[in-house]
Structures are given as C-alpha cells and as structure tokens.
C-alpha cells in the first residue's frame, strides 16, 4: 500500500469469493483487501477479471440481486456487510455505471432526482432545495426541467452522479464512468469528481481500463489478475514504473507517459483506384422537427478506414444508423455499391454490411454465445461443418471459447463487446460500421480488435469507426470526419486535424498524447 493508515478500514475483505450459479469458476477468488474511507483508489484488470462484480458486492447489490454464492467476508465499518438492514449499504456506497441510462427511472431530470429523495423519505417541501443544490454542484442547474433522453452522454453521466450525491454516500464507486464520453466531457467529469472528493473527503473507487487522466489523482492502484487474485496494490506511479512487463502480461493499459517507446503501427492505406463503396449526398435527419443531421455529404472507397469524431450528442451514432438503414433519413440519399440504400433487399444487404452497436446488448438475440456467433451463418445457409469451424475460430480469436454455452447477457461488459464484434465477422463484408467498439476493453483486446480490423481493411472492407479515443485515431486511422451539431466540420487526415486548435476546442476534441507531448517539448526547448 501507498501510505500507513492508523484508522479502521471502511471495507475489509477477508478471503472473499463470489461465484455466479451459472458459472463453474469464481468471478472473485479469495480476495483479501482493505479500503479506506478517504482514499482515491484505481481498480484495474483484464476484461472478465471480476472488477464490476467486486464493485456490486461492495455496494450490496450482490449477491442479493443475482443468483450467486459467496465465501469469506466483507466487513463494512467493522461489521459484516450481510448483517446491515436492506438498503443501508446501497445508500452509503453509491455507484455510477458506464451506461448512465441503466440507472434512470424517470423522463425529466428533476423527477429523476426527486425519485431518489422520495426513497430516502425526504419531505416534499425540502426536495426542490436539495435538487437545485446538487445540480448547482455539478454545473447542471439549467437542465432541471430537461428530458433526460435529450441530454448528451456527459450530461447524463453527471445526472447519474447527482443521483448518487443526493444520498450523501460515505463512498463512491465509479465503474468505467467516462468510457462513453467525448474527450472534454471526460476531463470535465474527472475534474468534477476530484473537486467533490476534496470538498467532502469522500473515498472513491475508480474502475477503468485507461487511467491516463486519473492516475495523477490516485492514492493507490489495485490490479486484479486474470485468475481473479490481487496482483498489485501500491502507488500508481510505482506500479507503472516498476511492473510494466507484469501489467502487459495481464492485458493492462499502461499510461503513455510511463512508456519510453511508443509502438508504431503501420497504417493500411487504401488504393486510390479502389471503387467507391458508399456515397452520401446532402443527408438530413430530423427528430421531432429538430435537425439532427444537416446536409451531410461524403464518400467512402473500398478498403478505406474512416473515423467519425465529435462530442456527445453531435449526431455520430444517428449517422451510422442512417448509413446502414436502421434509421430512415428524410432528405438526401445514400448509395451503397452504386445502388440506392433503400432499394436493397435487407437480407442481401446484411451479407455485404455489418454494424456493431454502441451497446452490445442491443444486438443479442440468442440464448448462447455460440448460437449468437453462428446465427448469421445459419441465415446464409452455411453447412453445419462450416458453421462449427468458423464459429469456433471466431470464439478463439475473441477469447470467448470458454464461454460458448453461456447466455450472452451473463458475460462481463468487455466480453459482451467482443461478442458483438465477433457476430459481424461471419464473412468478409464490403462495409463494416463500428460504434465505439473499444470502450470497456482491456489493452490486449483493443489491440487484437484493431489488428483484425486492419486485416479486413487490407482485404478491401471499408471501415467506418466512431470513437472518442484520440490516441487510437492517431495510431490507426487514415481519415477523420468531424461532426459538429449535425454537420461536417472537417474531412481529412488526422494529422491535419491535430493542428486545428480552434476546431478541436469548438468540437470538444483533444489532441492525442503524442501531439500534446510534442508541443510540451517544443515549449521547453524554446525556454
């Protein structure tokens, strides 16, 4: 550990194990760990190492909310967590998930926050004051009457945090809270958490795969191994400096500032002579008379890799869904392989295209992981031998073979994401669209996925890729399209984009680490 504590730990885990009844192996295995009330602790581990399960056990939701068994003990304030009256732990240990919508019950912001206070039996006469106070605290007072579904991802995450803060928790758990946020919303959310922590002295547990923007604030780094044991428990700086090989072996992303040599990936460049795969002409899309997409025009060639960037709520996901025919646009037209998109037979179109959703659960329709991957092949009349061979190959490539007979909805967040990508790769499609496919993924899986995408690109598949990861864009992508308030603000090489400071600021983007460090070195040299 990083510092001596004379006080009693807030949490004390003593050989604690948790196993889902549907699993043959424990998700958490004999963990012994002390967590202190005022510390900022980062929890890292490969996808499926038990991080989220541990968070839900600390919060008191598990094992009560699922079918699972525990061994050992979790003590909270020196008392076994199971001995507390129902609801006490949930109130004192707040949790914010990576998908804020999974926490919302109401339509309007004020009603959502009032619902929390009603459950705490707060008199109605006091509610308005408390709601305004917490919204003021997170900088969202002007949205008190807003519909939650109209808020951006960053704004929704702040409302989820406000719901937790209203309970005046003793401890806050953040389970990948910035995974879906644009670069500036991510920084703002982190700064908000740190400001709240300093003001209230509330302890925070941060579960993340990428901690470049968090680690400077943390007192402690705890790393769970792939076999669900504690591998590292010390200061982040010490761990990232001294244990890089160990962390890489455990598929942990090391913050870039600790890496001496940045890996260089050779980008796959499409042949300029390749035919056009997709054409978009003056596309407009409206929602309740509001223009979500305005006069969008661009084209994509076979074998081209385009990333679509923009702040939360800019229209990126809507554009992807229009491009694949999931949303019906109102003006303009889209041509795929020279033919109007709306004229294509849906079954034939699905053979040539693939779409990976932002939320993996939105595309699951089968009871087992194996059947989920095999589903498209069965629709396309593959032989049983072909289905078995191809499905097993994909499950191995995405490290899901050991989970092939599980229900997709019981997988970890990272495993669900890998499955959602695998289901789209039963053939080599002409066009693949990805909506933030790397969020929630460990470093190893992200690299594997990107290598697989580069292989598809080299075979002629056109790739359209939405992401908030600027380092990933800098490393892999040859062309960037920036959407701002529904319109195209930039279309060109990412290297050109990094030089346009005003545009980056307007669209809430950020230079990748490589560029930021280069600028710092130039400033130091000039001094």
Swiss-Prot record:
Q: Where does ATP 1 bind?
A: 45-52
GO molecular function terms noted in the UniProt entry: ATP binding; ATP hydrolysis activity; ATPase-coupled transmembrane transporter activity
| Gene3D superfamilies named in the record | P-loop containing nucleotide triphosphate hydrolases (3.40.50.300)
Recorded GO cellular component terms are: ATP-binding cassette (ABC) transporter complex
Tell me the compartments it is located in: Cell membrane
- Binding positions (ATP 2): 310-317
InterPro entries in alphabetical order: AAA+_ATPase, ABC_transporter-like_ATP-bd, ABC_transporter-like_CS, ABC_transpr_CbiO/EcfA_su, ECF_ABC_transporter_ATP-bd, P-loop_NTPase
Q: Where does the ABC transporter domain start and stop, copy by copy?
A: 11-251, 278-510
Top-level division of the source organism's lineage: Bacteria
Q: How does it sit in the membrane?
A: Peripheral membrane protein
Q: Which SUPFAM superfamilies match?
A: P-loop containing nucleoside triphosphate hydrolases
Q: Which EC numbers characterise this protein's activity in its record?
A: 7.-.-.-
Q: Name one Pfam family in it.
A: ABC_tran
Q: List UniProt keywords, sorted A-Z.
A: ATP-binding, Cell membrane, Membrane, Nucleotide-binding, Repeat, Translocase, Transport
Q: Look up keyword Transport and say if it applies.
A: yes
Q: Which family does it belong to?
A: Belongs to the ABC transporter superfamily.
Query: What does this protein's UniProt record list under function?
Result: Probably part of an ABC transporter complex. Responsible for energy coupling to the transport system.
- What is the name attached to this protein's record? Putative ABC transporter ATP-binding protein OB0804
Give the source species.
Answer: Oceanobacillus iheyensis (strain DSM 14371 / CIP 107618 / JCM 11309 / KCTC 3954 / HTE831)
